[in-house]
Amino acid sequence: MHGYSYEAMRLTAELNNAFHTPEEIREIMGRITGRPIDETFRLFPPFYTDFGKNIRIGRRVFINACCCFQDQGGISIGDGTLIGHRVTLATINHGLPPDRRHVHNIAPIVIGKDVWIGSGTILLPGVHVGDGAVVAAGSVVREDVPPRTIVAG
């Protein structure tokens, strides 16, 4: 696990510390995720991830600047999804009691097709966002979002 984390830090530093064309960004993201990235993908750096290999990105996905993906539990992003500035996708949490705080609770985040995640949103472990849903800017999402709904708060 630590080897992949250090590789993700190295690759995100490469991505974030110089200008890159869209083609170069896709190539670096392919190395971060360990899989090819579709030519319709767009990302505005900087971008941060602590693992990288558990991110799956569909077609026509746009990720805006300053997003943080904690992907050890797995992150899946469906086709046509838009992700705003400073969105955090967190797939790991810690136990609440002091004697359990070093225990990781891991659950995947699944984002459906044609979803819009507003700027500053935080999705917590285990959240599924249904197709066509909108999550308003600044939301903290701890429960599943049904398809074609708008949630805020």
Features from the language model and the residues they span:
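Terminal amphipathic alpha-helical/low-complexity segments used for targeting or macromolecular assembly
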Residues: 1-40
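Flexible, glycine/small-residue-enriched loop-and-beta-strand segment within the central core
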Residues: 47-57, 62-128
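Flexible glycine-rich beta->alpha loop in the catalytic core of nucleotide-sugar glycosyltransferases
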Residues: 87, 94, 139-140, 146
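Beta-rich strand-turn-strand
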Residues: 119-134, 138-144
